[in-house]
Amino acid sequence: MAKDDVIEVEGKVIDTMPNAMFTVELENGHQILATVSGKIRKNYIRILAGDRVTVEMSPYDLTRGRITYRFK
């Protein structure tokens, strides 16, 4: 997937699931299933319920995303 095709939105982590999956509520109210990107996983950045995050979504599947940044 090229970087041009990506949709970036902010959201809030609602629930944590097994295998580094998270339920994220976006700013527009939709809830999606998101996983952790490789750089966050590599640097052992912990994501907990209630954290504000940036999510990258593909225009082809708007129900899934990739967490790319956790706000402090």
From Swiss-Prot:
Gene3D superfamilies in UniProt: Nucleic acid-binding proteins
S1-like domain residues: 1-72
Primary localisation category: cytoplasm
One annotated Gene Ontology cellular component of this protein: cytosol
Cell compartment(s), UniProt: Cytoplasm
GO molecular function ontology, one term from the record: ribosome binding
Keyword annotations from UniProtKB, A to Z: Cytoplasm, Initiation factor, Protein biosynthesis, RNA-binding, rRNA-binding
CDD domains, per the entry: S1_IF1
InterPro entries: NA-bd_OB-fold, RNA-binding_domain_S1_IF1, S1_domain, TIF_IF1
Family: Belongs to the IF-1 family.
Function: One of the essential components for the initiation of protein synthesis. Stabilizes the binding of IF-2 and IF-3 on the 30S subunit to which N-formylmethionyl-tRNA(fMet) subsequently binds. Helps modulate mRNA selection, yielding the 30S pre-initiation complex (PIC). Upon addition of the 50S ribosomal subunit IF-1, IF-2 and IF-3 are released leaving the mature 70S translation initiation complex.
Quaternary structure annotation from Swiss-Prot or TrEMBL: Component of the 30S ribosomal translation pre-initiation complex which assembles on the 30S ribosome in the order IF-2 and IF-3, IF-1 and N-formylmethionyl-tRNA(fMet); mRNA recruitment can occur at any time during PIC assembly.
Entry protein name: Translation initiation factor IF-1
Origin species: Streptococcus gordonii (strain Challis / ATCC 35105 / BCRC 15272 / CH1 / DL1 / V288)
Lineage: Bacteria, Bacillati, Bacillota, Bacilli, Lactobacillales
